[in-house]
Amino acid sequence: MDRFTQLTLTSLVCASAAFSTLNASADIVISGTRIIYPQSSKDVTVKMENRGNNPLLVQSWLDDGRDTVNPQVLKLPFVVTPPVSRIDPSKGQTVRITWTQQPLTQDRESLFWFNVLEVPPKAKDADSQNALQLAFRTRIKMFFRPDGLQGDPAVAAGNLQWTQQGTALIANNSSPYYISMAKATITVKGKKIEVDSHTIPPLSHETIPVKNAPALQGGGIEYIAINDFGGTEKHQATIN
């Protein structure tokens, strides 16, 4: 990647968060909503498709949750190839992610984010010179899964323990796997309370604010978790 392209795409990365609030949609579609990277795998691949009508310049990279940091500054133990590619309409591109073998935590999963930034071609006609060129950014989770972790990721979400602390709900995750909760509904004394989506870290807990929270102990919670394949699974539990 030449220096000009590097600077241009870096600038677009910093601005893309603002673009995402506009009424438009991305043309690049990623196959899947998450990536699982088993430690024993040499690499993993991600497929992308351009479903728009124009060729697009696409940059791919990983971040560690700091989504506004210049990709050139992040020093992560992965290589993404190709980092920049052109994808024509109705065509696809496969991106390869390779772990560099730099040490990562071995007793639990590590979470990273796979980013795709698509840049449309510049308008050529005079009437379009002042048109706003939108760059779209898509992020999906990538879980690095060490070999030999205890338990089964397929059942981890169903084993969450729920407690109340003040006006917050505490989701306790005793497994070594991240749990992605799409939504949840608390039912207490016949009243239903909707809870926003959250990601519960492994061997830890997540504090979830609950507006106007009554006493929740003894109430029930129904929550939807996202599995390795992007599918959803419904679970029920009692709040202790």
Features from the language model and the residues they span:
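Bacterial N-terminal signal peptides that target proteins for export
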Residues: 1-11
